[in-house]
């Protein structure tokens, strides 16, 4: 288990962009942020960018913004994890995890800073062409949608609306992926 107050996930092939990531850490140092969101770069970025100072609750953020669910796209307070874990055995498990995490936060900063270097790989799960994998991806997405819908049904009204917005986004992605992943090549 991690020892610090904050957690950051990093894929083994990727890295943090130090000068820009330091800007994100300032929100932790000086603003007591619960979650700091940042952008990915696919090319090396040399200069630090200015960060956005606007703060939202997690519910407000989800209600008013399209969520990028990658667990590598933010740093967060470890105490938000109470009874929240990734579902084992499913693809894109962060699609289920991230909205539940964000909705728990009181102070979310969306910096727009490119602080994470994402290395594109042909062998990644998003590029897999195997039919069994495509079917699993669709089934797992459906499972995530149902899970978030069930959780939304138990939430207070304001949180429920925000979570249902995310469910609607995932449902549209699911429909799109059915078309893309099942068409003849």
Regions inferred by a protein language model and the residue ranges of each:
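Short aromatic/hydrophobic "clamp" motif used to bind/position activated sugar donors
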Residues: 7
């Amino acid at each position: 288990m991690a020892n610090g107050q904050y957690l950051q996930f990093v894929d083994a092939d990727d890295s943090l962009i130090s000068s820009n990531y330091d800007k994100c850490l300032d929100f932790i140092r000086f603003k007591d942020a619960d979650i700091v969101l940042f952008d990915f770069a696919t090319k090396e970025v040399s200069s630090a960018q200015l960060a956005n100072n606007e703060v939202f609750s997690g519910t407000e953020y989800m209600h008013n913004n399209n969520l990028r669910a990658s667990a590598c796209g933010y740093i967060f307070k470890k105490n938000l994890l109470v009874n929240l874990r990734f579902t084992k055995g499913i693809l894109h498990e962060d699609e289920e995890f991230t909205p539940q995490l964000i909705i728990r936060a009181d102070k979310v900063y969306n910096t727009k800073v490119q602080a994470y270097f994402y290395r594109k790989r042909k062998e990644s799960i998003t590029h897999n062409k195997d039919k069994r994998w495509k079917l699993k991806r669709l089934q797992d997405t459906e499972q995530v949608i149902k899970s978030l819908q069930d959780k939304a049904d138990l939430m207070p009204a304001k949180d429920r609306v925000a979570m249902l917005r995310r469910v609607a986004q995932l449902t549209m992605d699911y429909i799109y992926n059915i078309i893309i992943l099942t068409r003849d090549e």
